[in-house]
Amino acid sequence: MTKSIYILILLLCSSFISAQSDYWQQHVEYKINAQLDTSTHIIKAECGIQYFNNSPDTLDRIYFHLWANAFSNKTSSFADQAIKMGMTDYYFADDGELGGYQEITVALSSEEGELQLIYLDDQKEIAHVPIKGGVPPGEEICLIFYYELKIPNYFARLGKSNNLYNMVAWYPKPAVYDRNGWHTFPYLSMGEFYSEFANYEVTLSAPKGNTIAHSGYETKQYTNNDYQYKETRLENAHDYAWFASPDFIIEEEKVTLNNNQIVHVKIYRKPDDTIWPEAMLYTKQVLIYMADYMGDYPYSTLSIVQGEDSGLVGAMEYPSIKIIKNVRASDALEYYIAHEVGHAWFYAAIGSNERDESYFDEGLTSFLEQKYIAHYHEGDNYQNNKLPSFLLGSDKPILRHFTEGQICRHLHQPLTTPVAELSTINYGLNAYQIGSTLIAHTESLLGFNKVREILRSFYTEWKFKHPIYKDLLSHIERESKINLSGYNDILAGHAVDASISKVAGGTITITNKGKSEIMMPLLITYEDGTTERENVNPSQQDLILEKYKNIKSAILDPDQTSLDINPENNRYPRPGIGIRIFTGFDSPGKKDIYLSPLIGYNSYDGIMLGLSMYNSTFPAKNLKWNITPFYGFDSGQLVGQSWISYDTKFKSDKIRKIQYRLGIKSFSIANNEDANIQLRYIRIDPCITLHHYHNSASKLYSKTSLRQLWTGTDISYLEMDRFTQNITRLTHNRYNFDKLQPNELEVELEYNQYHAGSFLDSQDYLKLSLDYRHGFLFGKHRKLDIRLFAAKFLMNSQRQSSSYNNLLAQGSIALLNQGFTDYSYNDYYFDRQGQSKRAYRQIGYHGGGFKDALGSANGRIGQSNDFAMAINLKTHLPFGQAKLPLKLFFDAGYARTKSFSADPLKGEVFYSGGVMIEIGDGLFAFHLPLIVSQKISDIYKSESRNLLSKITFSMDLHRWNPWELADDYIF
């Protein structure tokens, strides 16, 4: 038996040694001479590349990245991604703001004549150089590139911003060739790089008066005519960046680390900044802390550069130099410095493939940054410090809440998803939050010292190499003897949901309700006051633990690092009820109920004071409810609304979830002050909604709902009669959140059966309507919105008698919408009967979407008992300040109807145009019609309306429903 164990150990060791000995990577030596012309914004350069083939293969070509060409046109992958991220600066840039290689040739250093540079496609970001005879294993080849590069305006990393030149991705780089072949990919803003380790000799020149910050260390500096020169070196790095500006001053200091390593630190900043003088202190603190945690800093220099505000990237790491945007808060500066300096270990020295595994370097670096912040700020979390304490609920980082919310809503994408296919939110959560949380969870399992020891040994083993994430997990398992197979479940996108399902005496049962079998810490408190902490691995079968003492309480995942989507069931006893105000992230130790005092108003209830009570904010729960009673001081009535909903979620490529909802609301609708009688309505609406699945990166969202509405409206002050409706609505909504051309479609089929007590026998109709909206972005922050609407009665028992919308005949198609046309009580109106001079100018955007308010006395104008259609236009001004909320609008509509049952159908055209002020994309708006059709004009004249009395307003609270936004926001 003992001999067998020895043999097994020998086999394992030999396998590990063999795997290490099989590892190889290519090597590059660069010799670059570059000159910056600030008058033309052009770099002229020679780039010598000595490429060492350490692979077992003969290479007949070498692939190169020419990433600066991403800024040469507006059809590049970078341009497409910028739009998907909601950034339009590059799309609307002038041709003169673009850049890229103007000229580029390549030759062998040992021969005259040019070599071919064959581009992979028209984008010219990826090219290969055919090598005659190839480069055999163990051999090398020397190439020289001659090029002129026009520097674009600053959009992402590379470019000119004010006086600052950001010189990154500025030279041809060989693509990585490893055991999986060539790794070629286009330049992206969201998604970084993978390059060969190299040594650099770089000579930089810029006009006198500019200060040059650069990777590596300086070997010589001199001036010649109007230019200054710097000769620099950098070893064991996979990139080289530099920055030039006449605005920099330099602070420098030699910092001795605790291991006696000396690092030359430089801060390049603007002289008049009030925050950046603290940068040196923060940099020294971070450098010393992280070197203590991880081991030797990999270079002899460290430079921090103050950047500008523009562009898509807030801060970027390069070997031995970091650039940080012009932050305006001290804690933000410290946070950015901590993160970017942390990249010296994970990114600069550990050269993982950032395009395939962004969560590797960003996750480990975020973990280091969090350790630093916690050390220097007594456990503070930078994310949470940005919010008031009443919102937090716990010390769990807010981005971890967002991560769990994405997973709960089945909008999360697996970490194995290629970066180019990720949505913006999922990229950020995958790379920074999940990546760091996995290591934090490892620390929760193993403890601070053990994880520090493991990361240090991993750094030593893989320094200046290209590991993959699997290498890290294997290293942790080997050094800790724990099973991390559950981490692969998380990488694949499986949800974590473990539960303490039963505790009886000293027996505890743990059930795995999710699909991820991740190991978790379990903290037990016994009835005698003692505690025990152990690691458990919930599997698909119940895990039953027998303890020797009675259990008082137990917490699974006490540090909240497992990404468990249902932390409430991680505790015994189950959480009690906690009362909180307004909103916030749920507390894991309590079932939170939120309270929000509210104030409201309508013409019949008067000023209303209310209290909203609800159980869910973010992340949204499956079971959600809201109770919001109001007291109306004018009516003396208790009014308000409530709803409850439940979500059933699916891991499907067809349906994301099904939501079941029941709502009820009731408010006053009229009053008789003399008789002291109030009329009110009540609405009850059960609904089932299918939320269809769309890839999270697609910007698409759609749902189909079946809603049954019952409304009852008092119509007699004698309280003897009530108007009732039974409305069935089948509605399909489709949204496309594209930045350049957002659009949405609603198709609805509505059947309504209604009657009015003794006044009217039961009547019914069937109506089909279509609402399509399309936006066209025609400049930075300038958009033209077009809306098309059409509706037709397919069947109608009463409209054949020419009845229009009133208490006895519902559902007219209205080109002009106000409270009295909102027959199903969908929206919020201050005055539904058009009787209050203060509130009757409120209009709605449903139906024809006209911006005029004619009042209930003119209710027949623009209504149809047969067919109607409309077009609504609104646009920013093509000149002036684009961010001003001032817009132009124009509405045109056609309504076909008949005045008497015997009359033929007759169509009529209406139009109205003017100016409007819109806030929050339709949340609130004020409209002033200036040009109107004859019939509308006649009413204005008959009522002697002046310009101010034509002003109308609208509010669309449904569009900004906080519960729907929290549940169904799309990024």
Where are these regions (language model features)?
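Amphipathic alpha-helical substructures
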Residues: 421, 426-504
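Acidic/His/Gly-enriched intrinsically disordered linker/tail segments
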Residues: 356, 362-437
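A surface-exposed beta-strand-loop module
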Residues: 52, 87-163, 540-549, 566
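Hydrophobic helix-coil surface modules that form long, contiguous segments used
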Residues: 176-178, 182, 190-338, 367-370
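Outer-membrane beta-barrel initiation region
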Residues: 520, 532, 536-539, 544-656, ...
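Glycine/proline-rich low-complexity spacer/linker segments in large multi-domain proteins
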Residues: 74-88, 148-200, 253-255, 562-589
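Beta-strand-rich binding/interaction modules
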Residues: 21-22, 213-214, 483-486, 498-558
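C-terminal outer-membrane beta-barrel translocator/porin domains of Gram-negative envelope proteins
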Residues: 599, 657-676, 684-691, 714, ...
